[in-house]
Amino acid sequence: ATDATPEEVRALFKNSRIIGRRFRLVHIRFGRDIIEVATFRAHDEDSPKTELDRHGRILRDNTFGEIEEDAMRRDFTVNALYYDIHDYSVLDYVGGLKDIEARQLRLIGDAATRYQEDPVRMLRAVRFAAKLDFSIEASAASAIYEYGHLLAVIPPARMFDEMIKLFHSGKAVRVFELLREYQLLKHLVPALDEWLQEDPNESMLDFIDQALVNTDDRVNTGQSVSPGFIFAILLWPVVQQQATRMQPDRQKMIGALAQVGETVMKRQVRHVSIPRRFSQMARDIWTSQPRFHRTQGKQPLRLLAYPVFRAAYDFMCIQ
């Protein structure tokens, strides 16, 4: 972060570009890396450079200010620390160091206002709490129940990005627990939340837990996890239940899984905009499951040649 405006930063670095409309930033290329540079911001609702919607959500915030003002615009105290490269000191204007010692996630300012400004802060609270093994301070935690519904105004494309951050954090098991605890799952995967409210069978809950354990293991060892696999996990209880009701005959299950999978996914993308390559992968994983029971003739060889065979096989093994 700097007191230089985006235009001033852009003028200093030829290998840079200004990005963003809501929050203008500068991306500076440094070899293969991109360094993101933000200008200190100030709070000024009356400025023409600050725009709010009817819910109080910040649509645009490009009112620049001083470092002390910028600290107050950050979401959490632990995320408002500044490293001074001149004397190697840490500048703390909001008590962030004390909260780190207490392993506590505290919002800066009034919780209701901060969540209304950007409802995604509730998801960030869950992600940071899970990733850092911190508790969420009482007022910040209680406000999540009241303002969780504001996630409905967030564009589905942004919700997809946040979902991936949550479940690719290496702490997906804890993330899932916190999303359920704070009643946020219904805004991300409503079909799964409804299934959980009914009377979910323990074996399927064990499946979700083990699948997320495996996901965390892969992330923490530097291996990739496709978003398609994540959504296949989270929606499988719903898809399997509805497909079984539609077609009890396991020999005819593939068609039922395909039909139900399409319906469930169509509903899901209204909340979280899943790119087609990932939604199709999830559906292919589901329809592959009955094929593992077909061992006659050339059917196993056909399954081996399936594009999602490896992911589908891992999925089957977890079950």
Residues of each region from the PLM?
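Catalytic cores of the polymerase beta-like nucleotidyltransferase superfamily
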Residues: A1-Q319
